[in-house]
Regions:
Chain B
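Glycine-centered hinge/linker elements that transmit conformational signals in sensory
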Residues: 185-186, 229-260, 306
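Hinge/lid segment of periplasmic solute-binding proteins
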Residues: 105-157, 214, 298, 303-304, ...
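Extracytoplasmic "Venus flytrap"/periplasmic binding protein-like
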Residues: 63-135, 140, 167-176, 270-271, ...
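Conserved C-terminal helix/tail region of periplasmic/extracytoplasmic solute-binding proteins
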Residues: 167-168, 190, 382-434
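Extracytoplasmic/periplasmic solute-binding protein
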Residues: 148-152, 157, 182-232, 277
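Extracytoplasmic/periplasmic substrate-recognition and gating elements
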Residues: 63, 67, 169, 248-255, ...
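Conserved N-terminal structural module of periplasmic/extracytoplasmic solute-binding proteins
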Residues: 2-110, 295, 310-312, 334-335, ...
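Long, aromatic- and glycine/proline-rich binding clefts that accommodate carbohydrate-like moieties
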Residues: 136-139, 304-305, 353-401
Length: 328, 434
């Protein structure tokens, strides 16, 4: 590959100066080309990232320091207002309530998703092929159903008048559930939304973790069996080390997705009742799209990014420190 | 991350669009007003909303306009309500906005309050038949004394009822006071109450346009102008009395409608179409929707105006409807004005009335008389009112409406009357008070 490999030197003679020079030049040029080529190949992707991600990011940051309502948008006037959007947002006690709620909500559904996915993945290893395929098809179906379609189904399940859940509970003897409203308080509404999001998120986590589990060779389990390890010990000693990096990764991804969840929350009760299920993503929508206050919305978007960076900082730190994505 | 960036990209796209196309307004308005009307040239783009005016009307209108102004072509486009505010915002921010637009009356102030968004039409009011403008609509199109929106059409709610059920229950005349209304509900329940699916009045918990009627009827209001701002008055005695009457209707009728949804979830017309509902508070064109389920309902249905607490009067009603406006950066303001002038002429206004809505620039309502539901609506419309002309009112309706939250909290017993109104008042002040 390198330019030096095939160069033969005439034996016992002082090599003339000129070819050496050219060789050296060639070598340098070759090295230079080698060094530049990867970057050239990266350029299209880099350009796409710059245009589609970095530039909008810079724009959002810039807009967050501007007053940009419909008037400014139409007239094209640029009104800089410094940190006003941030101080207004941060001095609103409601914002802190919503931030706290969003964090608790995210933590709860991420934990439920990972735990559910892990249990299902371990279960799938123990299932016979036929049952396993049935489980896998079911998971794929739950995963493949469009978000809004699933949301509509959940709305009907939990409907206070005609919902199948209340009817079933009534038949089972819990007569207090006739006409019970699952959306009467923020906590109850968020629980239903959480269940909905977990329902849609579990399949991806299950398949990722199952892929990790089937990567473990059968001999290791057999060895554990011969050593007389219990199911829990086998999991701790054999399965867990194999799937830990994947678990870290899907946790990270789940945090990102669930923190920004919007469609389900909005579709169920538009952040109600009485703002009780409003999360940061909903606030962003209300400010930006419903209220046309693009400057204030950009400030909230920036704050959300900062919060996300803080809670996922540990993962990013691991990612940059370890080689080849080894996160164990 | 991805979703967030999608949002960011969207926001940035809007900005890019503005940055590229700004600064092209305000130069071409002077051409029209010197002596003899200057001949109008160029195209005029008109955006009307779906369902606003029947195609027969707009076809004739566009034909007449093009015949009167040779060389002018009308680009007529029908828009959908869904997402219209964003679409209008983007269009107005662009370099070539439409020349005539229709804006929902509760959204007009949001556009009018920002200088340089809509053309000031104060001087042209008379040429648009200004003497006969429907007051409630005219108010919504006026901001700080200047006219930005020309009334287009309006509609208001009334009580739609089953004539056959009233007859069987022994109710001989339609209620003309709140007491008679409650009385009618009781009689209907006595007669049909053995059917568990029967509802004397279908009344969802968040029908807040009806609540407005009750609040106004009791002398209250949702907000009062306070200088340039608005001050919420949901905690006033009148507002509380309105809420109490709402609860009385819900409790007396024993309606099975959800307490945490409005009349569109589910569509109340569909519920009425099921044939087990004796009354609903709705708009005249909800009857054809109900008749799709059961065509016999058309003959069995009548209407009466929302009664007042004072016998013999009717309650004030919320006027829903649209205004017409001309974007400030329209390229053809002169043609747009001529177009609105023609549309606001009695000829086309009477066609609007015949199509079943209250015309915005004509007091001639005879077109509505042939329809029993329409004539009731027309009479009540003279007592029509609008929501506060606050620039922030759009935030109330397109976001989380505090009035709806107040209704649900009070009706479900989660909050007391005082607590519910105080909370909603604070929330409303936060939205429109600043």
């Amino acid at each position: 590959m390198t330019a030096t490999a095939n160069v033969t030197m005439p034996a016992g003679a002082t090599p003339p100066a000129s070819p050496r020079d050219t060789r050296a030049k060639k070598r340098r040029r070759g090295r230079f080309g080698d060094r530049v080529l990867p970057y050239l190949l990266l350029l299209p992707a880099l350009a796409a990232i710059l245009v589609l991600l970095a530039w909008p990011l810079v724009q959002v940051l810039a807009i967050s320091f501007r007053k940009l309502d419909i008037g400014q948008l139409v007239s094209g006037k640029t009104v800089w207002i410094g940190f006003d959007n941030y101080t207004n947002t941060l001095s609103d006690p409601e914002f802190w309530t919503v931030t706290f709620r969003t964090l608790v909500f995210t933590a709860a559904i991420v934990a439920a998703t990972i735990l559910g996915g892990l249990l299902l993945a371990v279960l799938m290893r123990h299932l016979g092929p036929v049952v396993r395929i049935i489980v896998q098809v079911t998971l794929v179906l739950a995963w493949a159903t469009p978000v809004i379609a699933t949301t509509t189904v959940f709305q009907w399940i939990f409907d206070e008048q005609y919902g199948i859940l209340n009817k079933t509970l009534d038949r089972l003897g819990f007569h207090g559930f006739i006409g019970f409203s699952w959306f009467s308080s923020g906590a109850s509404t968020l629980s239903v939304i959480g269940l909905l999001i977990v329902w849609q998120a579990v399949p991806f986590v299950t398949f990722s973790l199952y892929a990790g589990i089937i990567g473990v060779s059968r001999e290791q389990y057999e060895a554990a069996g011969i050593d007389g390890a219990s199911a829990w010990q086998t999991f701790r000693a054999v399965t867990w080390p194999a799937i830990k990096p994947i678990t870290t990764m899907v946790t990270f991804l789940s945090v990102l997705w669930d923190f920004n969840a919007f469609a389900q929350i909005w579709a169920i009760r538009e952040g109600g009742p009485d703002g009780g299920s409003t999360t940061l993503a909903v606030v962003l929508y209300l400010k930006g799209i419903a209220g046309n206050h693009f400057g204030a919305a950009a400030a909230i978007a920036t704050l959300m990014l900062i919060v996300l960076a803080l809670i996922t900082g540990r993962y990013i730190q691991l990612l940059t420190r370890t080689r080849e994505g080894d996160l164990s | 991350m991805k979703r967030w960036l999608k949002l960011a990209a969207g926001a940035a796209a809007v900005t890019l669009a503005t940055a590229g196309c700004a600064g092209s307004s305000g130069t071409d308005t002077a051409a029209s007003s010197s002596g003899a009307p200057a001949p109008i040239t160029g195209d005029v783009t008109v955006w009307l909303m779906t369902g606003s005016a029947p195609a027969t009307l707009t076809d004739a209108l566009n034909k007449e306009f093009e015949a009167a102004h040779p060389g002018v072509k009308v680009k007529y486009e029908i828009q959908q309500w869904d997402g219209i505010q964003q679409k209008l915002t983007t269009a107005l921010a662009g370099g070539t906005p439409p020349d005539v637009i229709e804006i929902g009356n509760t959204q007009t102030a949001a556009f009018a309050s920002n200088e340089g968004v809509l053309t000031d039409l104060t001087a042209d009011k008379d040429s648009f038949n200004g003497a006969q403008w429907l007051k409630g609509l005219a108010d919504s199109g006026t901001y700080e004394g200047k006219v930005y929106g020309v009334p287009f059409y309006a509609a208001n709610r009334e009580v739609i009822y089953r004539k056959d059920m009233f007859e069987q229950a022994g109710i001989t005349k339609t209620p003309t006071s709140n007491d008679e209304w409650i009385d009618a509900i009781t009689k209907l329940k006595t007669k049909f109450g053995s059917d568990p699916d029967f509802q004397a009045l279908y009344m969802p918990g968040q029908n807040w346009y009806s609540l407005l009627s009750f609040i106004w009827d009791n002398g209250g209001d949702i907000a009062q102008p306070d200088g340039k701002k608005f001050k919420a008055t949901l905690d006033s005695a009148g507002a509380k009395a309105g809420l109490e009457f709402y609860k009385k209707l819900v409790d007396t009728s024993g309606t099975k409608a959800p307490k945490d949804a409005d009349e569109a979830k589910p569509q109340q017309a569909t519920v009425y179409g099921g044939g087990k509902v004796a009354m609903m508070i709705g708009l005249p064109w909800e009857l054809p929707t109900a008749a799709k389920t059961d065509p016999s309902l058309t003959a069995k249905t009548g209407a009466f105006a929302i009664p007042s607490k004072t016998a013999g009067q009717t309650a004030p009603v919320f006027l829903g409807g649209s205004n017409l406006a001309i974007p400030a950066n329209s390229k053809n303001v002169a043609a747009a004005k001529e177009y609105i002038k023609l549309l606001s002429s009695p000829k086309y206004q009477s066609q609007l009335a015949a199509a079943g809505v209250v015309p915005g620039t004509s007091t001639d309502l005879t077109g509505l008389d042939k329809d029993p539901l329409g004539s009731v609506m027309a009479k009540a419309s003279t007592n029509g009112k609008a929501v506060p002309a606050s620039p922030q009112w759009g935030d109330v309706e397109s976001g989380q409406n505090p009035v709806k939250d107040m209704l649900t909290a009070y009706l479900t017993g989660k909050k007391t009357l005082d607590q519910a109104t105080a909370d909603a008042n604070a929330a409303l002040n936060k939205l429109i008070g600043g």
